[in-house]
Every structure is written in structure tokens, then in C-alpha cells.
């Protein structure tokens, strides 16, 4: 609910909480399909006022066809037993299409318009497609190939080092060490050698989305 909140220029929903609540309310009525709800790890890290777990409990209590994702199941096994995925703009839209799994996105993402995600144009369209989710077919070979190509580009080729920012895992930040490294980088920084700046100039010149 708190990850990448301001990343999109458009969304079918006002915010992530609205998307979650309205989606849960809709799938509550779609009991011919089983729904697994996976909370985002940031819910616990950021100690949010309301969470995915509490919203599911409040809206979908006693709905046997809606369950929280079990903690004892490896995330890597998910593609083996799901038929579709739904996200507002999360990494599911990048990952699951690589396995041929049709995936809904309801806000702008870096994969918007690439041809392998389901992108409803309105809330009504979104809810209608959820109601008919059993009729949605697996992705074809061309779509799967496109998804894999993008995945490789995004996670491998786009990983450009930034000469001015010290690398540190966001989950274990040592602020004193971070600022010490930042000071050292700043003292020897030369923007003419910065690969990121060179790449951004090319992107701006070509008016590229990525």
C-alpha cells in the first residue's frame, strides 16, 4: 500500500488503498474462482495504519474463495498453480507474463503498452474482466518472448552504476557509513565520466520512454 505511491502519471483508482478495497469488494462476488491475496512486505516494515491483511479480514471475512497467501509456500512456486495475476502496477506485471500468466495492471508502469499485460481502460472494464477471469487465455509465445526480453533489459541491461550515489541495501542502511562513502564519492566526482548522465542525455534526445 505504500510502495511506489507516486510512480504513475495515471491510475484507474485514486490510490492503492482504494484499488485494494474496491478490488476485494468486487472479487467477493466472484465465487466461481479462488483468489489468493499476497500482502506487500512494506506493510510490516512501514507499520501502516491499515494493511492488506486487515482489509481482507474486514471486507472478505467468511469468504472461502478468498484467502491470504500462505507464509509456508515459496514465492517461486506461484507460477505453477495460478491462472492469472492482478496488480495495480507491481512487479507481478513484469514477472508472471514470463511464464505465460495473464496479468492485470491498473496504473501506468514501465511495461504499459508493451502488448503482454491486460490493461483495462476504466473501472467498469476492469471489474467486467475480473468477472470473466475464467475466460482469459494464457499468453501466446510472442507475448511470453516480449515479457522475457523486457525482464532481461530491465533487470540486467538497465542496471547502470551511479558515480555520485553510494550503493547500500535499503533494508540495512548504516547512515554513518553511507554519508562517509557519499563524501568520498563527491570529492572525486566528475560529471563528464558519469555514465548515467550520458545515458539520460541519449534518452532525452530520442524522447525514449525507457
Locate predicted features.
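Nucleotide-activated donor-binding/catalytic signature segment of Leloir-type glycosyltransferases, i.e.
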Residues: 53-69
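Flexible loop/turn segments at secondary-structure boundaries
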Residues: 1-6, 42-47, 75-78, 93-95, ...
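Generic, well-ordered alpha-helical scaffold segments in large soluble proteins
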Residues: 22, 26-30, 59, 81, ...
Amino acid at each position: 500500500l505504500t510502495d511506489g505511491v507516486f510512480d504513475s502519471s495515471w491510475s484507474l483508482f485514486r490510490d492503492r488503498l482504494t484499488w485494494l478495497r474496491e478490488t476485494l469488494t468486487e472479487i467477493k462476488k466472484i465465487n466461481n474462482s479462488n483468489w489468493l491475496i499476497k500482502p506487500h512486505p512494506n506493510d510490516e516494515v512501514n507499520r501502516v495504519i491499515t494493511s492488506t491483511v486487515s482489509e481482507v479480514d474486514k471486507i472478505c471475512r467468511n469468504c472461502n474463495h478468498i484467502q491470504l497467501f500462505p507464509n509456508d509456500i515459496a514465492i517461486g512456486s506461484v507460477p505453477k498453480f495460478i491462472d492469472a495475476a492482478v496488480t495495480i502496477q507491481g512487479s507481478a506485471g513484469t514477472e508472471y507474463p514470463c511464464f505465460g500468466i495473464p496479468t492485470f495492471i491498473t496504473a501506468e508502469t514501465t511495461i504499459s503498452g508493451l502488448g503482454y499485460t491486460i490493461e483495462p481502460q476504466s473501472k467498469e472494464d476492469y471489474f467486467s474482466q475480473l468477472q470473466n477471469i475464467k475466460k482469459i487465455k494464457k499468453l501466446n509465445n510472442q507475448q511470453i518472448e516480449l515479457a522475457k526480453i523486457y525482464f532481461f533489459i530491465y533487470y540486467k541491461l538497465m542496471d547502470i552504476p551511479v558515480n555520485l550515489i553510494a550503493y547500500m541495501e535499503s533494508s540495512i542502511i548504516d547512515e554513518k557509513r553511507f554519508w562517509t562513502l557519499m563524501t568520498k564519492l563527491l570529492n572525486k566526482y566528475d560529471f563528464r565520466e558519469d555514465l548515467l548522465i550520458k545515458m539520460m542525455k541519449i534518452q532525452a534526445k530520442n524522447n525514449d520512454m525507457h
